[in-house]
């Protein structure tokens, strides 16, 4: 937990500092030129997406709330946490074989994003499974615990770690032609994460019409 305390202290220092600023620009992820917005029938069709929302992390010792920006593809994940004023406090850039975390002016690297986050922060955040859960999908190792009156998944359990992760889909919304969660809660022991997706956009490579120059 010492890692967690140092990690959250660093982030809260950034948040407190941003409160002294009169102006703060909202720093978003760099553009990905080979991906364009698209419409899908269901979230599973989107091999890439980007979202804007909020993330809240709670433990018995600490609480953290921040804006969340995330661009996901099969080749890369780019995740940014910012304060309400738009000041960046954390960035994570990950591929299947490498991960780079920047927080409080320091850089950390590992071959695995999930292992890197746990080593630096003390949080065992399921970064590898979150892309499925964020889009309301059930993984091969997930067990459905409850469904709602419409047959939509309401709660799942993932037992890859002990204690297991329990994911509750609190509400849903239409985005990019699909139904995706609006709010979801993740719990594992005394660690709780809440996610709110204010905007979710499916992305894909733009199609080139016949006879049209690329």
Swiss-Prot record:
Monomer. InterPro entries: LolA/LolB/LppX, OM_lipoprot_LolB. Keywords: Cell outer membrane, Chaperone, Lipoprotein, Membrane, Palmitate, Protein transport, Signal, Transport. This is Outer-membrane lipoprotein LolB. It holds the Pfam family LolB. The keyword Transport applies. A lipid is attached at residue 26 (S-diacylglycerol cysteine). A lipid is attached at residue 26 (N-palmitoyl cysteine). Plays a critical role in the incorporation of lipoproteins in the outer membrane after they are released by the LolA protein. PROSITE patterns: PROKAR_LIPOPROTEIN. Residues 1-25 form the signal peptide. GO terms for biological process: lipoprotein localization to outer membrane; protein transport. It is found in: Cell outer membrane. The gene is lolB. Belongs to the LolB family. GO terms for cellular component: cell outer membrane. It is a lipid-anchor.
């Amino acid at each position: 937990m010492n890692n967690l305390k140092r990690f959250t202290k660093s982030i809260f220092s950034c948040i407190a500092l941003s409160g002294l600023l009169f102006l703060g620009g909202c720093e978003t992820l760099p553009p990905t030129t080979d991906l364009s917005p698209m419409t899908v029938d269901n979230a599973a069709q989107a091999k890439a997406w980007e979202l804007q929302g909020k993330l809240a992390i709670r433990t018995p010792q600490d609480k953290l709330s921040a804006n969340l920006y995330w661009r996901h593809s099969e080749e890369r994940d780019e995740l940014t946490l910012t304060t309400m004023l738009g000041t960046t406090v954390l960035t994570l850039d990950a591929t299947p074989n490498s991960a780079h975390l920047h927080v409080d002016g320091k850089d950390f690297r590992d071959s695995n994003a999930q292992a890197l986050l746990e080593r630096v922060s003390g949080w065992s955040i399921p970064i590898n499974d979150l892309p499925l859960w964020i889009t309301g999908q059930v993984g091969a190792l997930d067990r459905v615990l409850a469904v709602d009156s419409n047959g939509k998944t309401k709660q799942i359990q993932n037992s890859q770690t002990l204690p297991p992760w329990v994911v509750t889909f609190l509400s849903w919304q239409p985005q990019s032609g699909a139904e995706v969660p609006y709010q979801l809660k993740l719990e594992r022991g005394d660690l709780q994460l809440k996610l709110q997706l204010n905007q979710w956009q499916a992305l894909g490579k733009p199609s080139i019409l016949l006879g049209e120059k690329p």
